[in-house]
């Protein structure tokens, strides 16, 4: 344990209050893999009946190996570090986890993110994807740095045919300085996705004082590749206690901070008031469910966990 600490959670009180008006509890998961009488939160983590939301996008870590060593990554472990080990579930374990996901009620999990590490380091990654499809998952996206797809377009074709719908592509900035890990490879990875009909979501890890001045540039680059890039998911860096307070304050950035910078860097084209928390879609879900009389997919996460907006390109201006 790390003891007590004080951290900035949400950078705007006004936005917090506005977002809180959209807070709605979901149905929860009625077939949890951790029973309530065994729960000792947070000592035995898992989906228990205390959860008020079902799995929206399930994440499966298929390896903790990576071909990069990004300093801010909470998965990155230096070689030789005491306690470090390789995690890589077998195909049988992958199938067992998929069966657990699909057993959730009232909404069987049907959306999966393959993550790591770098998933493409697994030689049997195509088999992993096929198992997910065999177990009934509709949507599969892969969290990746894209380097393999840039160097080997055939690999993109193989995972697409196996069942991957979308690349969740790490992309931290529009310059080599802010995005040293895959700056040169991203254009080639996009071309591989374009040729195979695979959509892309840019996933910038936003770090204050490092790349928070390029959020508008990232949006504009996505716009230039609108035929293949359908979204940008800005993720404020997760500082997991490996650095001191001064360092954390130097790099810490919250969702409202990102939204404010986007307004500034898009010259007001995307304003602070354009953003809504994830559960703002819940009333529409409830209406559709009322008409269909069947449980519908809910996005009932906490209102401070994320925000979104839509941007439309006007061809006439």
Language-model features: where?
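Ordered hydrophobic segments in well-structured contexts
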Residues: 1, 5-7, 307-311
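Conserved alpha-helical substructure of the radical SAM core
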Residues: 3-16, 21-144, 148-154, 158
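Phenylalanine-focused residue identity feature
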Residues: 10, 19-22, 74-75, 85-87, ...
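Generic structural motif
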Residues: 12, 65, 174, 237, ...
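A short acidic, helix-capping loop that chelates divalent metal ions and anchors anionic groups
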Residues: 80-82, 175-179, 242-245
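General structural signal for secondary-structure boundaries
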Residues: 87-97, 108, 168, 250-258, ...
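Radical SAM/AdoMet-radical enzyme domain recognition
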Residues: 95-114, 122-236
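Radical SAM enzyme [4Fe-4S]-AdoMet core and its adjacent flexible, acidic
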Residues: 183, 191-317
């Amino acid at each position: 344990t790390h003891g007590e600490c004080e951290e900035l959670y949400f950078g705007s009180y006004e936005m917090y209050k506005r977002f809180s008006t959209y807070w709605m509890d979901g149905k929860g998961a009625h077939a949890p893999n951790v029973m309530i009488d065994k729960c000792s939160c947070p000592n035995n983590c898992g989906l228990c009946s205390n959860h008020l939301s079902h799995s929206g996008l399930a994440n499966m870590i298929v390896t903790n190996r990576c071909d990069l060593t990004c300093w801010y990554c909470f998965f990155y472990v230096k070689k030789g570090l005491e306690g470090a080990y390789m995690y890589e579930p077998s195909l049988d374990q992958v199938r067992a986890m998929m069966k657990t996901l699909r057993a959730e009620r009232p909404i069987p999990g049907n959306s999966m993110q393959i993550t790591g590490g770098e998933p493409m380091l697994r030689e049997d990654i195509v088999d992993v994807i096929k198992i997910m499809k065999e177990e009934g998952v509709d949507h599969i996206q892969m969290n990746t740095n894209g380097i393999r797809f840039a160097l080997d377009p055939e690999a993109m074709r193989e995972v697409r045919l196996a069942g991957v719908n979308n690349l969740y592509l790490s992309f931290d900035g529009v310059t080599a300085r802010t995005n040293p890990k895959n700056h040169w490879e991203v254009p080639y990875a996009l071309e591989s996705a374009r040729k195979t009909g695979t959509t892309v979501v840019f996933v910038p890890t936003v770090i204050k004082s490092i790349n928070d001045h390029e959020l508008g540039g990232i949006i504009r680059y996505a716009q230039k590749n609108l035929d293949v890039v359908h979204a940008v998911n800005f993720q404020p860096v997760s500082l997991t206690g490996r650095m001191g307070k001064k360092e954390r304050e130097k790099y810490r950035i919250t969702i409202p901070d990102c939204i404010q910078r986007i307004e500034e860097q898009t010259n007001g084209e995307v304003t602070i008031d354009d953003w809504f928390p994830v559960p703002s879609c819940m009333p529409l879900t409830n209406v559709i469910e009322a008409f269909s009389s069947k449980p519908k997919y809910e996005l009932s996460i906490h209102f401070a966990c994320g925000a979104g907006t839509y941007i439309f390109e006007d061809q006439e201006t």
